[in-house]
Curated annotation (Swiss-Prot):
Organism: Streptococcus agalactiae serotype III (strain NEM316)
Function: Galactosyl transferase is essential for the assembly of the group B streptococci (GBS) type III capsular polysaccharide. May be involved in the formation of either or both galactosidic bonds by catalyzing the addition of galactose to an oligosaccharide precursor or to a lipid intermediate. Type III capsular polysaccharide consists of a linear backbone with short side chains ending in residues of N-acetylneuraminic acid or sialic acid.
Localization per record: Cell membrane
Gene label: cpsE
Topology relative to the membrane: Multi-pass membrane protein
Top EC category: transferase
One function term, GO molecular function aspect: phosphotransferase activity, for other substituted phosphate groups
InterPro entries membership: Bact_transf, EPS_sugar_tfrase
Entry protein name: Galactosyl transferase CpsE
GO biological process: polysaccharide biosynthetic process
Family stated for the protein in its record: Belongs to the bacterial sugar transferase family.
Length: 449
C-alpha cells in the first residue's frame, strides 16, 4: 500500500514536469497497473522484513528491471496510446527506484527502533517451576521487564530472593485473578512439558490468552491446541511458541500510527480554533475549561485523559448519589438527562466537540483515533479476565460502539462484545471505515447526547 503511494508520487511528478500534454488519468493508470504486475512477478513482497539493506537494494534493482522490460513491451504494442517520453520514463524509473529503496529502508529501521522501544516497555510475568528457574539466565541485553513471577511448585515464603529483586510473587491459586489486576503485556511459561498436565498449563494458557495478553510457551508445547493463533519465535534467548488471539500485520500497525499522528495534528488544529470561542463559555461557572482524569489504557497502563469540560465542577462527587439511577447494565455509568451536564455541555456533547482535546492523547501515543473507550480506574478495578480483553488494544476516540448506536447501547457486555469484535477483526482498513462512519455519525448527531 505504502509503496503504491511512492510510485504514484514519482510518476505524477515526473510526468507533470517533463512530459508535455500530459494525460494524467490514462498514463498514471498505466503506471500503477504495471507496478502491481511487477510487484508480484518480482516477489517484491517476499521476506520483506528479513531482507538486509544490501538485499533490499538488489530487490529494488530487480523490480526496476522488471518494470523497464514490461513497460517497454507495452510501449511497443501500444506506442501511439501514451504521451510518455523516453526522458520522462527513465527519470521516473530512477526517481521511483531511489524513493522505494529509501522508503523500504526507513520502514525496516522504524520497525527495529519501535520494536526495541516496545520491548523496553513490555511488562512480563514469568510462570515456571523451581528447577527451570534455577537454569534460567537473565541477560541484560534483553530489555523485557519482568514484573512478577509465579513458581508453580513453591510457596510464597520460599521466594524471598525474588521479592528482594522487586519481583511480585503470584500465588498459583490466584494467578488469573491477580493478572486481571496487573499491568501485563506478555506471559512467559518456562516449564518441562511432562509437568504441563500436573499444573494444568493448557487452562492457564487459555485463561491468560482470553485476557488479550500474549502468551509465550517453551517450544515443546507446539502440539497443544489453543483458542487463538500461535507462532514460533525467540524470547529471552529461548525458542518459544507464542500464543495470541490474533497477530497483526506490522505494516498495518505502522500505517495505524501514521494515521494517528496525521489525524491528531489536524484534530489539534481544529481544537485550537474551537477553543478560542468555546473556552470562555465553559469557564463562565468559574471552573476549568479542560477536564482531566486518570484513565486506563493498553493492558492496564494509567494515563491522563483530556476533554472539554461539559459537566459541573463537582460532577464526580454528585455521581455517587446518581449511581442508583444508572441506565447501563454492568461496569459503566450512563444517565439520560444527566443533571451534572452544564448548558454549554449539552451542546458540545451533542456535537462531540468535547472529545477534541483527546487528539493530544493520540499524538502522545496514549490513545489511537480508533480503538476501545478507556475506562476509569474504578471501573477497571472491577473487570474480570474476559472484560480486560478490551484493553489489549490501545484505546481510541471512536470505535465500533460509537458507530453502532452510541447511547442506544445500555448493556456493558454488548460493548465488550463490540470491542472484542473490533480487536479480532482489526486491520488498517477497518480503522479507515470506522473513521468515515464516525464522521457521518458526528455530522448527523446520531445517538450523541
Amino acid at each position: 500500500m505504502i509503496q503504491t503511494v511512492v510510485v504514484y508520487f514519482s510518476a505524477s511528478l515526473t510526468l507533470t514536469l517533463i512530459t508535455p500534454n500530459f494525460k494524467s488519468n490514462k498514463d498514471l493508470l498505466f503506471v500503477l497497473l504495471i507496478h502491481y504486475i511487477v510487484f508480484y512477478l518480482s516477489d517484491f513482497y517476499r521476506d520483506f522484513w528479513s531482507r538486509g539493506y544490501l538485499e533490499e537494494f538488489k530487490m529494488v534493482l530487480k523490480y526496476s528491471f522488471y518494470y523497464i522490460f514490461i513497460s517497454s513491451s507495452l510501449f511497443f504494442i501500444f506506442k501511439n496510446s501514451f504521451t510518455t517520453t523516453r526522458l520522462s520514463f527513465f527519470t521516473f524509473i530512477a526517481m521511483n527506484s531511489i524513493l522505494l529503496y529509501l522508503l523500504n529502508s526507513f520502514l525496516k529501521y522504524y520497525r527495529k527502533y519501535s520494536y526495541a522501544k516496545f520491548s523496553r516497555d513490555t511488562k512480563v510475568v514469568l510462570i515456571t517451576n523451581k528447577d527451570s528457574l534455577s537454569k534460567m539466565t537473565f541477560r541484560n541485553k534483553y530489555d523485557h521487564n519482568y514484573i512478577a513471577v509465579c513458581i508453580l511448585d513453591s510457596s510464597e515464603k520460599d521466594c524471598y530472593d525474588l521479592k528482594h529483586n522487586s519481583l511480585r510473587i503470584i500465588n498459583k491459586d490466584a494467578l488469573t485473578s491477580e493478572l486481571t489486576c496487573l499491568t501485563v503485556d506478555q506471559a512467559f511459561i518456562n516449564i518441562p512439558i511432562e509437568l504441563f498436565g500436573k499444573y494444568q498449563i493448557q487452562d492457564i494458557i487459555n485463561d491468560i490468552e482470553a485476557m488479550g495478553v500474549i502468551v509465550n510457551v517453551n517450544v515443546e508445547a507446539l502440539s497443544f491446541d489453543n483458542i487463538g493463533e500461535k507462532r514460533i519465535q525467540t524470547f529471552e534467548g529461548y525458542s518459544v511458541i507464542t500464543y495470541s488471539m490474533k497477530f497483526y500485520k506490522y505494516s498495518h500497525l505502522i500505517a495505524k500510527r501514521f494515521l494517528d499522528i496525521t489525524g491528531a495534528i489536524i484534530g489539534l488544529l481544529i481544537c485550537g480554533i474551537v477553543a478560542i470561542f468555546l473556552v470562555p463559555q465553559i469557564r463562565k461557572d468559574g471552573g476549568p475549561a479542560i477536564f482531566s482524569q486518570n484513565r486506563v489504557g493498553r493492558n492496564g497502563r494509567i494515563f491522563r485523559f483530556y476533554k472539554f469540560r461539559s459537566m459541573r465542577v463537582d460532577a464526580e462527587q454528585i455521581k455517587k448519589d446518581l449511581l442508583v439511577h444508572n441506565q447501563m447494565t454492568g461496569l459503566m455509568f450512563k444517565l439520560e438527562d444527566d443533571p451534572r451536564i452544564t448548558k454549554i455541555g449539552k451542546f458540545i456533547r451533542k456535537t462531540s466537540i468535547d472529545e477534541l482535546p483527546q487528539f493530544y492523547n493520540v499524538l502522545k501515543g496514549d490513545m489511537s483515533l480508533v480503538g476501545t473507550r478507556p475506562p476509569t480506574v474504578d471501573e477497571y478495578e472491577k473487570y474480570n479476565s474476559t472484560q480486560k480483553r478490551r484493553l489489549s488494544f490501545k484505546p481510541g476516540i471512536t470505535g465500533l460502539w460509537q458507530i453502532s448506536g452510541r447511547n442506544n447501547i445500555t448493556d456493558f457486555d454488548e460493548i465488550v462484545k463490540l470491542d472484542v469484535q473490533y480487536i479480532n477483526e482489526w486491520s488498517i482498513w477497518s480503522d479507515i471505515k470506522i473513521i468515515l462512519l464516525t464522521l457521518k455519525v458526528v455530522l448527523l448527531g446520531t445517538g450523541a447526547k
